[in-house]
Regions:
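Hydrophobic core segments of alpha-helical transmembrane domains in multi-pass membrane transport
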Residues: 10-21, 35-47, 100-109, 177, ...
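Juxtamembrane and boundary regions of transmembrane helices in multi-pass small-molecule transporters
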Residues: 161, 185-243, 380, 385, ...
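Intrinsically disordered, low-complexity non-transmembrane regions of multi-pass membrane transporters
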Residues: 1, 61-62, 72-81, 217-265
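Structural signature of hydrophobic alpha-helical transmembrane segments
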Residues: 1-11, 95, 295-299, 356-368
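Transmembrane helical segments that form the transport core of multi-pass membrane transport proteins
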Residues: 263-346
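N-terminal alpha-helical transmembrane segments of multi-pass membrane transport
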Residues: 1-93, 256-259, 263, 272-284, ...
Length: 415
């Protein structure tokens, strides 16, 4: 029964994407099927194939070890306050948010040295060749395995002005459906296994292509609609270019790149901290008001998103929990949801815990729309109106990317 419900969930999700589609007749069914099949293969290799699981665990250990070096800088600056084992216990602002500064600096260095760009170009080129997506959008989709929603477009900033609306939609969906490497240790610090996060990140490019190319597929030229012809012309122009990934940005040298990365990390940590203070306090206020009626915001969200929890094929006792977490992620943010999931994992099965974690991977929430519009339009002001027009569907698409990845992994485990 679990397998049937899980499979039904994938079918219903694809049906929902079809209903959301702006150009139903132009959906490239061959592309969608190919991307889905490859996503299933990747999921199988990571969660069922013995060598794949061993490799994933090794990579997870390496990533965790590398990212943990941020504790050295935090220990120097904050002393025992940076040690979770000290009498002061866990101090989220220091031990979780503080580590973002180191990771952001590391990403800045890898980005400047061209290491991230090289990986993106290899994997993105392979995906583009197999699926027929343009080089630009393939690179951006893959870049979101490592970079955030406003960071990945930097790689191809000079091509943004030539991108079609379908390609812009993929930029939005892959951005909001992904995680940045800079926050991985933050999630891990809340009790989420790095292995779970890496699986979720690996499935982002293919899931983003499936979702975006159903919601807004590339258009077919029509003599009756000049706008469609213009959109197609822009897509062909962007696809025909030899895409050169920009690694240097505005940085003069490696030291400047590291410094810029650290500053970006500080701003990100401050932004996340400010959001958490505001959101947690406001939720407490709302729950205080709702308490008069004997309900809470968490209970409301659990029932609103219950159909998704059911279609994930989870045990009955886990459905409302998963639904409430999904609601918290979409309405509030993923940090709140991961913070709630972490303490629960020990009481969940491997399948339930992994599915819930993957479903929360990604930046898709209400505030992300504004972040994407303002962040990406800095590189391409002429696309601001297009970004604003597509942002809401982009957010829903990013949310559904994580749900689709969760359903795919859940089905692989259940079979």
């Amino acid at each position: 029964m679990t397998i049937l419900i899980n499979a039904l969930g994938i079918v219903i999700l694809l049906g929902a994407l079809y209903l959301l589609s702006s150009n139903k007749k132009d959906i490239n069914k061959k592309l969608i099927i190919k991307a889905l099949l490859i996503q299933f293969v990747v999921a199988f290799l990571l969660v069922k194939f013995p060598l794949g699981r061993i490799a994933l665990q090794k990579v997870s250990d390496v990533v965790t070890n590398v990212l943990s070096y941020g504790k050295e800088g935090l220990g120097f600056l904050f002393g025992p306050l940076a040690d979770a084992g000290a009498p002061t216990g866990m101090i989220f602002a220091i031990q979780v948010l503080g580590n973002i500064i180191f990771i952001s600096a590391l990403v800045g260095a890898l980005y400047y040295l061209g290491i991230i760009g090289f990986i993106v170009k290899i994997i993105g080129g392979a995906i583009g060749s197999v699926l027929g997506t343009s080089k630009v959008e393939s690179f951006v989709a893959v870049a979101n395995m490592f970079l955030g929603q406003t960071e990945s477009p930097i790689l191809v900033a000079k091509y943004l002005k030539d991108m079609s609306q379908s390609e812009i939609m993929l930029v939005l969906i892959s951005g909001m459906g992904s995680m940045s490497a800079t926050v991985l240790m933050g999630y891990a610090g809340m009790g989420i296994p790095m292995e779970y996060l890496l699986i979720g990140g690996a499935l982002v490019p293919l899931g983003s292509i499936v979702v975006s190319k159903m919601i807004l597929p590339e258009v077919v030229p029509s003599l009756a609609d000049q706008d469609l012809q213009d959109d197609l012309a822009q897509a062909e122009a962007a696809a025909s270019k030899e895409v050169k990934i920009d690694n240097k940005g505005d940085n003069a040298n490696l030291i400047a790149a590291i410094s810029q990365g650290a500053n970006d990390g500080l701003n990100m940590a401050l932004g996340i901290g400010a959001s958490l203070i505001a959101i947690i306090s406001l939720v407490a206020l709302v729950n205080g008001l709702l308490g008069v009626f004997g309900i809470s915001l968490e209970q409301i969200l659990s029932y609103v998103f219950a159909p998704i929890g059911f279609l994930m094929g989870l045990p009955k006792q886990d459905i409302l929990t998963a639904s409430q977490l999904l609601g918290s992620k979409l309405v509030l943010n993923e940090f709140i949801a991961f913070g709630q999931l972490g303490p629960m994992l020990s009481g969940l099965s491997y399948r339930s815990g992994l599915m819930m974690a993957i479903s929360l991977c990604g930046f898709a929430n209400i505030s992300s729309m504004g972040i994407c519009i303002s962040g990406i339009s800095v590189f391409c002001p002429e696309k601001r109106n297009v970004l604003a027009k597509l942002a809401f569907k982009g957010m829903l698409g990013g949310f559904l990317v994580s749900v689709l990845s969760s359903l795919v992994v859940g089905l692989i485990i259940a079979i």
